[in-house]
Amino acid sequence: MSPGNKIQAFGDDLISIDVSSPAEAQLLAERLRATGDWIEVVGGIDAVVLQFDAVLHDLDLVIRKIHETTSQDEPVVAMSPDVVEIPVCYGREFGPDFDAVCAMLKLSAEELIALHAGHDYTVDMLGFTPGFAYIGGLDERLGVPRLREPRVSVVAGSVGIADGRTGLYALPGPGGWVLIGRTSYPLFDATADQPFALKAGMRVRFVAVPEL
């Protein structure tokens, strides 16, 4: 964290720390969690939010502890060395917005798939709904906004794009992302110690498949 990072207080027990990238957010969040001083630490895309015990810590002490934690030299942020390949069946009933995206962007089905699949991406964060993955690195030629009217229910495994990212639904739920496909990759396992397959910092690659 650099001296210029903005720190803001929200309410009596929340602090937000602005960062310059998702990678910096995850690194800072890991450092803060390691101290054991905080109730919860969440790394996002451009900020880290931490919750503290307002009875044990006043705001000045919290800010001082944050600076102490981050004053050491920052190591190089390394991405996960492994790439998780995620099979995606594009279009048809699996991607209800696929044809509309092709028409909007003046792309053939093959061109859209080629722009989305076969490239390495990085999971920026999980959020919105449990296990939902915000994945950075989307080709700028696939720039589309979110839906004006979000869907009440989206099938688990759905692959959406919007606002420069790919969104991956680990669980069914509402959502306004533009759906172009679906994966059969096991994104959620309730019996596992870590129930969600993806986490921030992981590298993924979408692979086009004809059927789920």
Task: Please describe what each predicted stretch is.
Residues 1-212:
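Glycine-rich active-site loops that engage anionic ligands at enzyme catalytic sites
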